[in-house]
Amino acid sequence: MQEKVIDNVVLVLPGTVALSWLVMLVINGALGQGLVLRFKRNMRPNPDFAMLELPNWLSVLGAALLIGSIILPGSFGYFAKNAAFIMALPFFLVGLSVIHVAARRISAGMLLLILFYLLMLLFGWPAIFVAFFGLIEQRAGFRRKWASASKEE
């Protein structure tokens, strides 16, 4: 049992370490941006994270790595698995921006966001769905549709 757990962890350990480092980099960047904005020391305008978009080739690369992680054997599969793990972060961030835009559209949005983040912190697995939602958003464009619908109202 213990060996099986170790074998499974080893499969994604490099990707997990890199992803952890990148998440801390994003969090520290956002906190730093918030601080300089609060003290009015920012040299550039605050980015609109709600409208975060990724280049189209990133979707293709992410999908290819995901498929490769499933079907490729040996070292290539190991590389694809860890690279797909790392590539999930940009799509996770896009998925979060979609959730935030959707929460703005409803009256109890802040409460739902708090519950969602608690669920994600407690269980972790909702992050996978958020990343897939970000991948789908790249093609579907929910946020643009919602923004144009709210302008028409």
What are these regions (language model features)?
Residues 10-11, 62, 77, 113:
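Select transmembrane alpha-helical segments in multipass membrane proteins
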Residues 39-95:
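Small-residue-rich helix-loop
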Residues 13-40:
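Transmembrane alpha-helical segments in integral membrane proteins
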Residues 10-18, 22, 78-82, 86:
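Hydrophobic, aromatic-rich alpha-helical transmembrane segments
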Residues 75-153:
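Long, positively charged, glycine-interspersed low-complexity recognition regions
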Residues 35, 67-68, 99, 118:
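Broad structural signal for hydrophobic residues in well-ordered alpha-helices, predominantly aliphatic
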Residues 1-10:
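Membrane-interface interhelical loops and short interface/amphipathic helices
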